[in-house]
Amino acid sequence: MTELRHDRPQPRSPRQDRPEARSQPKTQAEAGRFTRRTVLKATGAFGLAAVAQPLVGKRWSFIRDLGPAAATPLEHIVIDCQENRSFDHYYGFAPFADGFGPPAGWDQPDGNGGTVAPYRFMDLATPDVGHSWDAVQAEWNGGAMDGFFTTDGIWALGYYTGEELPFYYSLFDEFTLCGNYFCSLLGPTWPNRFYLAAGTSGGITTNGVWGYGVFDYPIILDLLEAKGISWKVYNIGWDSVPYGNTDNVFVFWKRWAKDRRTHGNRGDYLNDLRRGRLPQVAFIVPSYARGWDEHPPADVSVGMGIQEDLVTALRESSVWERSAYIITYDEHGGYFDHVPPPHIDAFGLGIRVPTWVISPFAKPSHIEGTVYDHVSTLKLLEHVFDLPTLASVNHLFDVSTPTGPNYEAANGASAGPPAPPRDELAVLGDMTECFTF
């Protein structure tokens, strides 16, 4: 593995079914007092060549050779995808985020010649902010990362600390935080969750698609099924309505929309742990309606509390010593982040999101600098369970998959030509870098 290191200034201590947020207040008077800073000016265009530039966190790591799958002690992998939080919004000012949070003086132009600095959220429930395809393009601004305030207002610049997120911050003592995990696409929920299932969004860039069984191309469940790897999707907080979980991405695929394993619930998860029957691969889908997925304006302590319960149940089970639990977020939700994402194709990568790797084999008190996106979780499953890549089985991508207008997403359209899965791209790590084995 070859690493390119980049020393940066130290940080300061301290859908269709869910409409996008309206414009938020943009004045300091509306949200309290803020410190004025000097704007950090972006230099040059941020294009495909930026993949080779050391712009990410404290270090940028490349995987040169995918190589054959190797034996690992992991027998169970749990993947939980929460909603709408950025890395800097949750951990940018954490004392352990040295070199991965905003550098001293980082701020945002206010659109009137001044600047506005990030500030601490004192409320656990705050308004939703813009995270549509168009809004995120403006926030990203070609890699300048200077459009959060002018696009979404003062609410986009709030951050939390360990006082508001005690369970999450406590994880650092024992486990690994990913410092360069990006969502897959510069856009909202559904296309990012498609990457988590399929390694591609099929060209879709908006939440303007919905329906059970509308897709029929291969996803990770097909690979697991073909290899005889047990799996289940646990819908946490959606116990009463069959097929009614609006955050369960797997119901979009014909083969799995009504499969009973796609519709497990919280009770199933707890019972499976008590009986030592946790499947080899488990996906956790917390309820959006109850705010358990942390999607604004939900109280962040509620979703965090659910995560603490789920993680604790795993740690107290007989399978813990052979397990890993990953907590990630589908996209950044419009909240600020200072790191320009690698621009690897017309769709992304997207903005950085917080991601924990919780396992007896996770590197303790460690921030991993390898570049990841949601496809990296698929690469981990492929590595641990010796699966083929989705790119290898999906080379004849179904171009009839509904994608809206067939324009280039890179040129600002709401959709683009279907793109192949990313799980053979060497620029994306497979998350084994987070473990001690």
What are these regions (language model features)?
Residues 2-8, 12-18, 22-437:
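N-terminal pro-sequences and low-complexity stem/linker regions of secreted or lumenal proteins
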